Amino acid sequence: MRFSTQMMYQQNMRGITNSQAEWMKYGEQMSTGKRVVNPSDDPIAASQAVVLSQAQAQNSQYTLARTFATQKVSLEESVLSQVTTAIQNAQEKIVYASNGTLSDDDRASLATDIQGLRDQLLNLANTTDGNGRYIFAGYKTETAPFSEEKGKYVGGAESIKQQVDASRSMVIGHTGDKIFDSITSNAVAEPDGSASETNLFAMLDSAIAALKTPVADSEADKETAAAALDKTNRGLKNSLNNVLTVRAELGTQLNELESLDSLGSDRALGQTQQMSDLVDVDWNATISSYIMQQTALQASYKAFTDMQGLSLFQLSK
């Protein structure tokens, strides 16, 4: 009889322990909002959640990379917008300077104006970002890409690239020689077949030198100066077309970054929903199970209490 009593006691204790464990499990799920708190709760879901968490982290990294890329590309576009305006202003000065009726003093004044535009363009070519890094220097960001005197490019040879999505990498920092020392393949050719000037600063230096040279007393000097101005005018047109080509590329990249951001946001929402489906609680089901398990636990307590109240005489009946 004592063996039977012990058996009943152990069974009741197991019932209480099991009910209490289940009740506490549902309580923990309700307090955390998670159905899968420990891997043992659902090994398959827990494993899938780990993989999904890694995908979420990668998506977040690409989002951050696109933010950085957008800032870099936007800054470059803003600077090149100013470069475009400066080149157009220089073109206007060169066209006006080609007027054969100007005096040497007028020409010298125009030379001063064009020198100011050259200085402005050189300053733009050596633009730095908020961290003091030169944006047109490639990976040599700590050194000014263009020399002050001749405007020669001394920056890095490789453009800065950024991985902005799993399968997309783009240039976010052009080297200065691709902008200020380059022309497009369909550039206006020189009438005599000679090589076209590619360096924007050399073009302007040629015009400045021609305008500073007095020509009032020499037809030959006038012709030489006019030829230099004509060549500069052709060069500026080629340089402007090159800058506009780069700006078109930047505009396309900004649009693409915006599209990738939209896709990334959609991907993040989908991943969040997937993660919720895997590990979050079903509140209706969990609350119902919590209440049912609480009721079962109370019943187990009552059964155990009732059993303890029984005498050996009552048990023997």
Curated annotation (Swiss-Prot):
Key words of the record: Bacterial flagellum, Secreted
Spell out the protein name for this chain.
Flagellar hook-associated protein 3
Q: Name one GO biological process term.
A: bacterial-type flagellum-dependent cell motility
Give a yes or no for keyword Acyltransferase in this entry: no
The record's section on PANTHER family has:
FLAGELLAR HOOK-ASSOCIATED PROTEIN 3 (PTHR42792:SF1), FLAGELLIN (PTHR42792)
Task: List localization entries.
Answer: Secreted; Bacterial flagellum
- UniProt keyword Transcription present: no
What are the GO MF terms of this UniProt record? structural molecule activity
Q: Which family does it belong to?
A: Belongs to the bacterial flagellin family.
> What is the organism of origin for this protein?
Escherichia coli (strain K12)
Gene symbol here is flgL
- NCBIfam families listed in its UniProt record: flagell_flgL
**One Pfam family linked to the record:** Flagellin_N
A GO CC term assigned to this protein in UniProt: bacterial-type flagellum hook
Outcome of R168C? Answer: In HAP3; exhibits impaired swimming only when in contact with a solid surface or a semisolid matrix
